[in-house]
Amino acid sequence: MKKEKLRTENISFQYPGAATYALKDVSFSLYEGEWVSVIGQNGSGKSTLAKLLNGLFLPEAGTITVNDTMVLSEETVWDVRKQIGMVFQNPDNQFVGTTVQDDVVFGLENIGMPREQMVERLDQALRLVRMEDFLNDEPHSLSGGQKQRVAIAGVLALQPSILILDEATSMLDPQGRREVVETVRQLVNEKGITVLSITHDLEEAAQSDRVIILNKGEILEEGTPEQIFKSSHMLQEIGLDVPFSVKIAELLKRNEILLQNTHLTMESLVNELWRLHSKK
């Protein structure tokens, strides 16, 4: 059984002056080497959840436990932040160095890491995100996807237990989103890194291992992408959609073209359509 990396138990949070809870009685776990996406419409509590997990806010009720032993509190918040790395929405707002190298080692310099170890961490982190050839490039010369990969490298250099992506692909073009999603999948599959993705991009969520739907601050549903995106009517009722490939598959079904599998990407859908066509 995979090791539990993070657990929330019945956490609730209400902003001062708000009439309702931003999060209410939310419980879930993250496991080693797992990529979980949290989706929901605006106001569902996604961003509040990210802030709670990183200790920017503390829950009014319930507990957040990291690595099965560390419970988030005012006393432990800095230790928790060492275990949870975050990548945010705007890549330009995350750069603090004049080059890729400077940016990735910034956090390591702040904790006084010896230079020899720092160079090793820098090389390792950039290789993980396939940006080792851009060591001396300036941020403005990079694409959006490349900037986010560097931001991920800066977090990975600190070797956290969990990587949280807070709408990390929302400001990227399609190519940039693909680059980041491919990088995340590689980190999970090859390095066993645990990832929580807060996102409104359903195509991105479809690539993860598990999906949690937040609605009005509560967990509405949880399951694999295949399980979640089969319930298109339920998603549409709460203001969400389904991946484009799922929409196309539903249209084909109405026209009596039955597919064997649930397709969460266009590539997968096209491959099955080609197989069906080749049998004719």
From Swiss-Prot:
Its EC number is 7.-.-.-. GO terms for cellular component: ATP-binding cassette (ABC) transporter complex. Residues 6-241 form the ABC transporter domain. The keyword Cell membrane applies. It is a peripheral membrane protein. ATP binds at G40, Q41, N42, G43, S44, G45, K46, S47. SMART domains: AAA. Keywords: ATP-binding, Cell membrane, Membrane, Nucleotide-binding, Translocase, Transport. It is found in: Cell membrane. InterPro entries: AAA+_ATPase, ABC_transporter-like_ATP-bd, ABC_transporter-like_CS, ABC_transpr_CbiO/EcfA_su, ECF_ABC_transporter_ATP-bd, EcfA_1, P-loop_NTPase. It comes from the Bacteria. It is an enzyme of class 7 (translocase). GO terms for molecular function: ATP binding; ATP hydrolysis activity; ATPase-coupled transmembrane transporter activity. ATP-binding (A) component of a common energy-coupling factor (ECF) ABC-transporter complex. Unlike classic ABC transporters this ECF transporter provides the energy necessary to transport a number of different substrates. PANTHER family: ENERGY-COUPLING FACTOR TRANSPORTER ATP-BINDING PROTEIN ECFA1, HEAVY METAL TRANSPORTER. Forms a stable energy-coupling factor (ECF) transporter complex composed of 2 membrane-embedded substrate-binding proteins (S component), 2 ATP-binding proteins (A component) and 2 transmembrane proteins (T component). Belongs to the ABC transporter superfamily. Energy-coupling factor EcfA family. This is Energy-coupling factor transporter ATP-binding protein EcfA1.
